[in-house]
């Protein structure tokens, strides 16, 4: 992602075409995610509801509020402010599951949080953006809800349904599903970087500073929040990473 984003920044036409397919690319990524979800993954609701509720609550409170505070503290322009808030109000990204695994965190909890924060996103994300971003730009609540349903909820549920109907076929291609989702997200992000290269230059270092602070605050506050409820290292690590890593692809699609 970093390498191709740099290429897109230096040579904008290389990936700028991808912006014409923003919703499609995100839909492909979400559909790929749905294909990897088994019904057993939903058992965490009944077997570990405490950790799941703690994680999802932290997800939809810490990052949105940190985004709002950063936008106010740095006196961001309306465009930048709503962009930061959009990212903050989105659910966790699937990359958090990989990072949690590498960090020796509770991968099952991370996957559960990603699934359920994604399923909650069509209802919670638009409301949060409406409440926190309304002071900068006019936000159409209904239009945003419909957008999230279209590019997130329907593709994910479609993927889950296909897996249940054709499990043997899906298992055969299971190893390449993450690659398909990654390619879609990389093209999506690279396209946005390429088409907004001039704006990124104009904004200067402030964008970099705000993004870094947003992620660091999310990780640290997520970890602290988990520790308040006496979650062990593995569970606290999963919560911290899930809170600190957002589904930026969804934010791009909604922007």
Spell out what each predicted region is.
Residues 1-255:
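Alpha-helical transmembrane segments of multi-pass small-molecule/ion transporters
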